[in-house]
């Protein structure tokens, strides 16, 4: 077996780690528990070529597919069946993790060992070759969508804690990632790497001691090693004064990136269990918002002010809602008794479930909310996504990034709203 596979740990051990991460943390996009205390917390790259996977209009539409989706009954074939495979320009496979200064595989079983039957597979045929699992399904997806770009995402909310340590030797870190992403075992599947270092030079459950230049150093190292392949990153959307955007020089890092995903969601949620209720993905501020600067427009404005080119910024859209129970007030700002019950984990639910069981009853700050009995949820709908994409076009942004595909409706309503608006 190849060197890249030898560097990973055993399949069984990885499977346990991946499932645990999926069950215990909100799928990688949260801002450091998003409490009010959060606010207290140069060589030139080659020009991005035409081989970036953009649409005819130049708009980028990224969809995340998570490795642990297989344990929730969602597979690459579902992306095809929903129609979303024809609408996204890039697919990020999330997540690998970082340990001992290197990129590591998250779950070997899900990634390349799980057998797919004809009924489950993109090709409609049983697995017969040595390469199986998600990666083989992604290979089949690219065969029917040859313009689709597939990137391997590393880090995220759970697994980015060790990136600061890895940055003690940026080139070694980047080379290890290159070797895994481009392992001959899955040659041609991946077109580059996406780096989910969400909180450089800031504190979360531990404190990253990188300096403000560390993000740029990382992106430079990855560009040097990956060459013409895609190099992207998912970054914080904390637009508060003195917040997480201010802690890092994102403009310097953007020089080496094809684009940056701004994770403009998970601003508010049940980590404040008694409320106040607030929309987790506000595009703009509103009277009574719990933390100034916790909205998409503030984040984009701050990144532009740093010098990040508009066309390298993607607006984040989430397929999940966040909610509370014990709420009597229909409008935002009400008290609660705790996280709302869910088919997933308390306080977070897929759009496809909420649209059917708790339809939106109002909008605020460019997103939707719903009051159903004693439950209060906020989430985006096709209508609010359409408005957000219109705003993104007005701002000259490069497109959108969607976390994540399994939460969308069976007909891909949210992805379709992104695609339709960006390309009209």
Cite the ranges covered by each PLM segment:
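Glycan-recognition patch characteristic of GH18 chitinases/ENGases
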Residues: 46-183
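Conserved, mostly hydrophobic/aromatic
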Residues: 91, 152, 195, 222, ...
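Short, acidic/polar
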Residues: 69-85, 166-186, 239-251, 296, ...
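Active-site groove signature of glycoside hydrolases
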Residues: 177-209, 266
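Extracellular low-complexity, Gly/Ser/Thr-rich intrinsically disordered linkers
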Residues: 69, 352-424
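N-terminal secretory signal peptides that target proteins for export/translocation
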Residues: 1-12
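C-terminal region of N-terminal signal peptides and the immediate post-cleavage residues
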Residues: 10-11, 16-19, 27-54
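Substrate-binding surface in catalytic domains of secreted glycosidases
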Residues: 104-125, 200-348
